[in-house]
């Protein structure tokens, strides 16, 4: 089975949607036809309800940091078990807009939640299930927030302080440095430069995994 799970990560305004299009175009140019898209939190009826609570909060009750992270993992296990794993088993490639790395960075770095607790949650909920490749779009938070604000109204998390996003970015960078399956892309460059870097990184990874010839075969 040659299906793979590729995740795109980064702060608000990093360009994840654009990156997803580039990844899909690159894969399809090499013969990958079956692609499933996911987003976190969300992607199933229950996970989408949790997404709304996480993103918008509640008018009459504060969402605590631990409640937030537990909702994220509840949404994640629904998505993984009901969508991602079945798609992979069916031979489809899955492209995810965020996955567990977001929780490790946002909740572990930004919120300051105990990292051992987060690792324990990850291992309990996901077991040894991990993305095959993660593309981390690295961007100074000030630039990302400026881009996010230009898109319109900010959600509950996007309204956090610059310091929150600085901590989140630092944790992303730490985690990327520890894991060879996480490739860092400089997202502060022009769209053309970012696109070229993503294409090059993805093609090199396909080659290293011995997948380039396999995915090209149907063409």
Swiss-Prot record:
Binding site for ATP: 10-17
GO CC, alphabetical: cytosol
One GO MF term: dTMP kinase activity
Known catalytic reactions: dTMP + ATP = dTDP + ADP
Gene3D superfamilies, per database record: P-loop containing nucleotide triphosphate hydrolases
Keyword Transferase found: yes
Pfam families, A to Z: Thymidylate_kin
Enzyme class: transferase
GO biological process: one example: dUDP biosynthetic process
Keyword DNA-binding: no
Annotated signal peptide: none
EC number: 2.7.4.9
Domain of life: Bacteria
Keywords carried by this UniProt record: ATP-binding, Kinase, Nucleotide biosynthesis, Nucleotide-binding, Transferase
SUPFAM superfamilies: P-loop containing nucleoside triphosphate hydrolases
Function noted in UniProt: Phosphorylation of dTMP to form dTDP in both de novo and salvage pathways of dTTP synthesis.
Family of this protein: Belongs to the thymidylate kinase family.
Protein known as: Thymidylate kinase
Gene that this polypeptide is encoded by: tmk
């Amino acid at each position: 089975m040659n299906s793979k799970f590729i995740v795109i990560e980064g702060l608000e305004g990093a360009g994840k949607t654009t990156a997803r299009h580039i990844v899909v175009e690159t894969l399809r140019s090499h013969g990958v036809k079956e692609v499933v898209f996911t987003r976190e939190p969300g992607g199933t009826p229950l996970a989408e309800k949790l997404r709304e609570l996480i993103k918008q909060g509640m008018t009459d009750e504060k969402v605590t940091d631990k409640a937030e992270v537990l909702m994220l993992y509840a949404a994640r296990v629904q998505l993984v078990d009901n969508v991602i794993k079945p798609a992979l088993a069916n031979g489809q490639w899955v492209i995810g807009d965020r996955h567990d790395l977001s929780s490790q960075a946002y909740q572990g770095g930004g919120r300051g939640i105990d990292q051992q607790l987060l690792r324990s949650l990850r291992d309990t909920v996901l077991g040894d299930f991990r993305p095959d490749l993660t593309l981390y779009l690295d961007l100074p938070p000030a630039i990302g927030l400026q881009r996010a604000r230009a898109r319109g109204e900010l959600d509950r998390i996007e309204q956090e302080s610059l310091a929150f996003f600085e901590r989140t970015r630092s944790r992303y960078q730490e985690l990327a440095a520890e894991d060879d399956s996480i490739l860092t892309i400089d997202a502060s460059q022009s769209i053309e430069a970012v696109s070229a870097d993503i294409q090059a990184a993805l093609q090199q990874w396909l080659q290293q995994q011995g997948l380039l010839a396999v995915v090209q075969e149907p063409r």
